[in-house]
């Protein structure tokens, strides 16, 4: 599981700048934490900071998310970021997705 994912992440992002590798890693980790019901608002805030303030190639992030089979998750997380911490659309690398998967993410967030 996780070792394969780490190798795939390394292969897919081998030629990408560090910023893109970091954001992609954050997304992979967020998905894992959510599956274990261990994602906190702090994790969400860190993802928000990265997406909003780090200078990265947004279209490349979308391509990476497709290669990593993370695109729907990325889009759902953008919706969560918009709803929970008010990420504006101008900072979103992709279209947010509001569906049952996004609501599941919200229900699994540890809001303390």
Give the predicted meaning of each segment:
Residues 1-112:
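Conserved NTP-donor binding/palm subdomain of two-metal-ion nucleotidyltransferases/polymerases, i.e.
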């Amino acid at each position: 599981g996780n070792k394969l994912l780490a190798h795939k992440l390394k292969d897919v992002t081998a030629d990408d700048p560090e910023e893109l590798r970091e954001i992609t890693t954050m997304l992979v980790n967020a998905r894992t934490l959510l599956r274990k019901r261990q994602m906190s608002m702090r994790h969400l805030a860190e993802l928000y900071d990265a997406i909003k303030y780090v200078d990265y190639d947004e279209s490349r992030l979308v391509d990476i998310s497709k290669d990593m089979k993370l695109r729907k998750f990325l889009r759902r997380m953008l919706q969560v970021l918009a709803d929970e911490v008010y990420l504006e659309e101008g900072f979103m690398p992709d279209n947010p997705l509001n569906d049952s998967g996004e609501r599941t993410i919200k229900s699994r967030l540890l809001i303390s």
